[in-house]
Structure formats: C-alpha cells, structure tokens
Amino acid sequence: MSVFGLQRLYIGGGYVDATSGKTFDTFDPATGELLAQVQQASAADVDRAVASAQEGQREWAAMTAMQRSRILRRAVDLLRERNDELAALETRDTGKPIGETLAVDIVTGADVIEYYAGLATAIEGLQVPLRAESFVYTRREPLGVCAGIGAWNYPIQIACWKTAPALAAGNAMVFKPSEVTPLTALKLAEIYTEAGVPAGVFNVVQGDGSVGALLTGHPDIAKVSFTGGVETGKKVMSLAGASSLKEVTMELGGKSPLIVFDDADLDRAADIAVTANFFSSGQVCTNGTRVFVHRSIKDAFTQRVLERVKRIRVGKPTDADTNFGPLVSAAQLDKVLGFIESGKAEGAKLLAGGTRLTDGHFGSGQYVAPTVFGDCRDDMKIVREEIFGPVMSILDFESEDEVIARANDTHYGLAAGVVTENLSRAHRTIHRLEAGICWINTWGESPAEMPVGGYKQSGVGRENGITTLEHYTRIKSVQVELGRYNPVF
C-alpha cells in the first residue's frame, strides 16, 4: 500500500487516466517506503495533452496581459499559502531536509512566477519610422504550446521556473516531471487551475525518457525547455531540430570551479565551499565541486572545511534539525559511491566521509557521508566528471593565470566563483572564466531577476531574468505604407 495512492495525469484542467495501462513507483529516499504508483502517459495521452494545450492557449493568449498577470499573481498567493504542505510533499519525494524545502523550493518558485506576472504587461513591440509616409512596427506574439521537461533535484521549483515566462507570454505548457520525483508538479497544476488559468494551459504528463521524447518530437510543440544531463540534452536538441526545428532552452550539467585566492577570508571561503558542495546533499547542478585553493593557504583552508563538515547534521529529512538528507534514489547512491571509489583508486586523499551510512535508520535510506578529497589532480575522474553528489575535490594552484586556465579546461561552463578581498582580481578573474553563472565572495543564490544558464555544453539559452521572457515570444514585423504604392511592373 502506497502513502499517496495512484497518481494520474493532469490534462484539460483536471485529472485523467492514462491509456497506457502502465504505472511506475516512486519511493521515499530516506526510508525506502513506497510513496505512490504513477500512471505513465502513452503517445495518445501526449497527443491529448498537446491538443488540450492548443485549445487552452488560444483562450489564454486572447486575454489581456493584465488579466494573465492577475491570474498568475493568484497562483503565487496560493503557492505561498500552501508552502508548508508542498514542502512536506517535496521532502518525502526528494529526501531534502524539511528546513530546506520550507525555505527554498516553493519560495523561489513562487518568486519567479511573481516576477514574470509583473513583466507580462511589459511585453511590447517597436515602431520604426522609415520615411514620412511609411513605418515598421513589431509585435511580440506567443509561440503557442511549449514543452517543459524537469529534473529530479528541484521538481516544483523547476516547474515554476519553466511555466512562469511561458505563461506570462501567453503560451501553454505540457510539462513532464522526472519520473524519480513526480508528485509536486501535479500540485502546481491544481494551483494554476484554482487561480483561474484556463483548462489545458498547464498539463502534466508522467513517465520516463520515452515520454520526454514524445514531447520533444511532437510536431505541434513550438519550444522545449529541458533541465537534465548533457547527454540527454544533446538528444533533446537533436530530436527537437529534426522534428520541426523547435526552439530549445537547456540547463544541463556542470563541474564548476570555486577559486580561493591567498588573500581570501578563510572562514568565509570555507563556509562558501561547504555550501557549494553539500547543500541539498550535493545534488545541485551549479555546485562548486572543483575547489582550487592557493597553495600557501591550502592547509589552513582544508582544516576549516573539515571542521564545518563535522558540524553537518545528517538525519531524517522530516526532522527540523537535519540539514543533510539522503540522495534521491538507489541508482544515484550507486553512482556517487562509484565516483568515490574512483577517487580512492586514482590516488586522491580521502579527508572525510567516503562511505555509505547504514547505521540505524540510515540503513533503509540512500545516505552517503559528506565526502572531501584532497591532493586531487585535474586528470582524475572525480575532478573531470559531474558527480551530482556530496563530493568535494580540493586542488591547489600557484598563479592567477594558471588557475584560470585549469578552471576553463572542461567541456562544462555552468557556474564559477572566486573568493578574494581584491576587487580588481575578482572581476578580472570572473571576466576570464568560461561560465554562465558567476559569484564573487558568495555562492548559489539564483534570484528571479538573474539569468541562469551555461556556456559550452552546460546549456543553451537562459532561465529567469528579462531575457528569458523574450525567448517565449516570436517577433512579427509589419510595414505600413501610408503613401502611394510604386509598382514595379
């Protein structure tokens, strides 16, 4: 018997049964308890969701921008009213500590919807005079039906981040959450409907990557916004282009450098490094897992990091005192443990953690101890590949030019950060780092106003910020001739 019972699809403003006859299970990563059986969408269900979205989008786009803005603001109010309920569900589904989900996941999702609700009325075109009797004007029009494909680490936040600009611009969205964490996207659908979003404007289909492929290849979808791994992202981009030249936004993986210079405040640097590696049990795409520390301060910095790691409170995610929970699944646990063994085998010095936690209640969950490796080299697997778990690699460096070259020596380019008291060095270094999201003397905050996305193979396009709204519209150019038409023939 599952905790939440059978979960259906959400299409056309309400719950409907999938036609596939298939279900999949979702589990509590802290206890192994069966949370729900979830119906998997078929190709016919995806077609139904897209058709429903097309119908709803026509009604939604016909509303004034102010009407859409007011409805989205009501959704924000409902999200905030239900913050505690949604946070508790997100904690069960992801294994994140309740203190984290209460303060971050729904809060930041609501903030982004509120931000774009405010921008909905600011979507406007241009008027360009050509000559006395002729001018051009432009219109920004919605794309139509968009697809959103979410990741398992921030389920409801990602759903909010993808729907907010899409809906603000007058589009509809068919959303597929990760099959690992499928529950809270359905609650967001309920909230949008209660707020007054027309039926079909936000539909949720469930399933694995095959359902994502159906969305990506669907001829009636105009844009795909995907969050996930690099290899899957390449497949999404290929299928989106091959099917109908869809627009794509992709936020992919990272192996981000955090550079600690010799003039850094060591306590601040250690605090930043621990947050940048162990928040959300290390399951954050922007984590600063390659920690480059100037050789002259490496020992003192490492000591401070280890002191802070000892203070991490690993425990049950539902306990208010816990600030470090399990990994999201058994598969993710096995992957992370494999990387840890690789680090040991390649000669990295294990300074903390490095094991699965199995004592007491930990034994039924997917827990791994916060892990720190020292004496790391650039060619090690734990340094070059994205782990997506609580594994910090400490490397030393001598010069600014050297560390910048090493930091950039990766096919990733999602995030980067520096810790230094020298303002000139901070900006000089950041300007040379090949990363789309950068922090100086801090790490990790992604406010609604800040565009989020990567360089290189870490992504295409951006989430959040004003620029993202533009990419959920298309420009129509119109020339108006007030004078006499001069025929060619």
UniProtKB/Swiss-Prot annotation:
Binds 2 potassium ions per subunit. GO terms for biological process: glycine betaine biosynthetic process from choline. Involved in the biosynthesis of the osmoprotectant glycine betaine. Catalyzes the irreversible oxidation of betaine aldehyde to the corresponding acid. CDD domains: ALDH_F9_TMBADH. It comes from Burkholderia lata (strain ATCC 17760 / DSM 23089 / LMG 22485 / NCIMB 9086 / R18194 / 383). The keyword Manganese does not apply. Its cofactor is K(+). The modification Cysteine sulfenic acid (-SOH) is found at residue 285. It catalyses: betaine aldehyde + NAD(+) + H2O = glycine betaine + NADH + 2 H(+). Its EC number is 1.2.1.8. PROSITE patterns: ALDEHYDE_DEHYDR_CYS (PS00070), ALDEHYDE_DEHYDR_GLU (PS00687). GO terms for molecular function: betaine-aldehyde dehydrogenase (NAD+) activity; metal ion binding. Keywords: Metal-binding, NAD, NADP, Oxidation, Oxidoreductase, Potassium. The record marks 247 as: Seems to be a necessary countercharge to the potassium cations. The gene is betB. Belongs to the aldehyde dehydrogenase family. K(+) 2 binds at residues 245, 456, 459. InterPro entries: Ald_DH/histidinol_DH, Ald_DH_C, Ald_DH_CS_CYS, Ald_DH_CS_GLU, Ald_DH_N, Aldehyde_DH_dom, BADH. Dimer of dimers. SUPFAM superfamilies: ALDH-like (SSF53720). NAD(+) binds at residues 150-152, 176-179, 229-232, 253, 285, 386. K(+) 1 binds at residues 26, 93, 180. Pathway: Amine and polyamine biosynthesis; betaine biosynthesis via choline pathway; betaine from betaine aldehyde: step 1/1. The active site is at residues 162, 251, 285, 463. It is an enzyme of class 1 (oxidoreductase). This is Betaine aldehyde dehydrogenase.
